[in-house]
A protein has these predicted regions:
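N-terminal loops that bind phosphate or other acidic moieties
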Residues: 1-129, 133-323
Length: 323
């Protein structure tokens, strides 16, 4: 399942690299959804690649799904621009600027609707990914409100940590909230400082666990923040995280420290794009993009299906060439 969301925080200059051009950044989730579903763009003629020219992680996810032959399902949880492919609409509002108002005022409704949706899904394993520009900043703010002195990753090679911390300080000061003060009220942390992806994934996870399904959260530090919420709700015991080596190895993200603090199982997919002839893929080895669109989970599914690094890389290259 891929959760599609937008947040006004993505429009803070320099905070997100999820899109080729800043003026099109809110189109990124819709473009990612179209690539994952159809392998081609319909809504916008501009690729959702990073400003550096690194390929969108949507191509990594598309390749993993092609190889594993796993079904996928798109969920609109607060989009401003909708994709030209089928999706389930939660009728959620997009995320607001957490510095000036609550980020997700409809968080309880999103959680409830998502929990009901999960109850209607027939599967053994639910792999849940996300695409939301600016999501690492809202993740950082929620983690701080819950009392985790963690860092988050970035789609940029050079993580703009100072800018993210500034946004977090302004948001928490404006809401008169101190670090750790919302540990016993995680959904209030989501409502004040989160984005629409978070209550959706929380609700989906809750619904799947209630019906005896296994849940794999496909993502890095953003899914780490969701795992922190689940932990405080006593829902994290049967949840696993799967991300890419680029997040695991990112010293600025301190992902392993977060996982250890959460006491949750996590593992990493290890692609190798250094052999690729496509420069947009080679940039992953230089620290660009790292994760997103459930890429780590899709790679894991390809691995479970018996495909090695070379086969996976070749499939990603084929997806890019078809675009």
């Amino acid at each position: 399942l891929l959760v599609l969301s937008n947040s006004e925080i993505a429009t803070v200059t320099g905070i997100s690299g999820a899109g080729s051009f800043e003026q099109y950044i809110q189109y990124t989730p819709a473009a990612d959804a179209e690539i994952v579903s159809n392998g081609k763009l319909k809504t916008i003629g501009v690729m959702s690649d990073a400003p550096s020219g690194a390929a969108t992680p949507a191509v990594l996810t598309r390749a993993g799904l092609n190889l594993s032959q796993c079904a996928h399902f798109l969920i609109n949880s607060g989009l401003q621009i909708v994709p030209g492919v089928p999706y389930y609409d939660l009728r959620a509002k997009h995320g607001y600027d957490i510095r000036v108002r609550p980020g997700v005022p409809d968080a309880p409704e999103i959680r409830d609707a998502s929990r009901r949706l999960a109850g209607c899904c027939d599967c053994d394993l639910a792999v849940i990914g996300e695409t939301i520009p600016g999501g690492t900043t809202t993740a950082l703010c929620v983690l701080r409100a819950l009392g985790y002195n963690a860092n988050v990753s970035s789609s940029f090679a050079a993580n703009p940590t100072a800018l993210k911390e500034k946004v977090v300080r302004e948001a928490m000061y404006g809401a008169s909230i101190s670090p750790g003060s919302l540990r016993d009220d995680p959904m209030r942390a989501v409502k004040l400082f989160g984005d629409p992806m978070m209550p959706c994934v929380v609700g989906l996870t809750e619904g799947f666990l209630n019906s005896g399904k296994e849940v794999l959260l496909a993502g890095g530090t953003q899914m780490g923040a969701v795992a922190a919420i689940l932990k405080e709700l006593n829902l994290s015991d049967d949840v696993v995280l799967a991300t890419t080596k680029y997040v695991f190895d990112d010293a600025s993200a301190r992902f392993i420290e977060l996982v250890e603090a959460l006491e949750i199982d996590a593992f990493s997919a290890y692609p190798d794009f250094s052999k690729s002839s496509i420069s947009a893929l080679q940039k992953y080895e230089q620290g660009e993009v790292k994760e997103g669109v459930g890429a780590g989970g899709a790679m894991t599914l390809a691995c479970i299906s018996g495909y090695d690094q070379d086969a996976y890389r070749q499939e990603v290259e084929a997806v890019i060439k078809q675009l």
